[in-house]
Regions:
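TPR alpha-solenoid repeat register
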Residues: 69, 103, 157, 192, ...
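Canonical tetratricopeptide repeat
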Residues: 72, 106, 160, 195, ...
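Canonical positions in the second alpha-helix
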Residues: 59, 93, 146-147, 181-182, ...
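Terminal, low-structured helical/coil segments at or just beyond the last alpha-helical repeat
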Residues: 191, 199-242
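N-terminal leader/linker segments that initiate helical-solenoid repeat arrays
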Residues: 20-76, 80
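Short coil/linker segments at helix-helix boundaries
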Residues: 34, 84, 109-142, 167
Length: 242
């Protein structure tokens, strides 16, 4: 009986290692056939995506690799300020990794930039460009919110949506909880303090705005910011006592 069991386990082990060897051989043959191993340049990444997308049904693991390459390619385009191409790469990467908060954040960043590059090239009137701009801004908003829903403490997305609400939508009240949460961990970020103080001022929360400007002055990030904080504080105090 022991000999039979021993023979059985040996047989199973042979099948397991043979399967692993076969799988690795397929991977090696695929790379040799397609000429894709470890792409690094934009051109190599684009070529790898094209080739592996066609063969994705061959090996399920290639799906994850394609998603990673889309993210890498997107960051390369983002570094070169090619926001449209970068955004498409990140959107494609989301299809492979729908629970990755970073990818939604990058989509939001690109959409925000694209909103400010939208011009009426086709001569359809200003309304056409305005609609496209708003669509990009809504995409940015939804992407930030999705990133935050995945990771509620994702401070970059918290700051991003705060800026979006204050400077793009003029919805300062919506920005406040996100910026407050951001500053609960990023205690010395004076840029966020300026944005939140502006939101407080716009919603008539003058004392909170003054308190933030005092904090900026106390932190002394640089002479220019201190001077701006002092000027803004005076403006708030003037409005408060009118």
């Amino acid at each position: 009986m022991k000999k039979i069991l021993k023979s059985f386990f040996v047989f199973c082990a042979m099948i397991f290692f043979a399967s692993c060897s076969s799988y690795n051989s397929v991977k090696r043959m695929q790379r040799m056939e397609e000429g894709v191993a470890n792409p690094t340049t934009k051109e190599e990444l684009e070529e790898a995506i094209k080739k592996y997308e066609k063969r994705a049904m061959d090996l399920a693991l290639t799906d994850g690799q394609v998603g990673i390459w889309y993210k890498i390619l997107g960051t390369r385009y983002l570094d070169q300020r090619l926001y449209g191409k970068a955004m498409e790469c990140f959107k494609n990467a989301v299809a492979y990794y729908p629970d990755n908060a970073n990818l939604y954040y990058y989509v939001a960043i690109c959409a925000g930039y694209m909103a400010h590059t939208e011009l009426d090239y086709e001569g359809n009137g200003a309304s056409s460009a305005a609609i496209k701009k708003m669509n990009y801004l809504k995409l940015a908003e939804n992407s930030y919110l999705q990133a935050i829903s995945i990771n509620p403490n994702y401070y970059r997305a918290l700051y991003g949506i705060g800026v979006l609400y204050v400077f793009e939508f003029g919805e300062d009240e919506k920005a406040i909880p996100y910026l407050e949460k951001f500053l609960s961990t990023q205690l010395k970020d004076t840029d966020a303090m300026f944005v939140l103080a502006r939101a407080y001022y716009s919603t008539y929360q003058y004392e909170k705005a003054v308190s933030l400007y005092d904090k900026i002055i106390e932190l002394k990030p640089n002479a220019e910011k201190v001077q701006e904080a002092q000027a803004n504080k005076s403006k708030v105090l003037e409005a408060q006592y009118q």
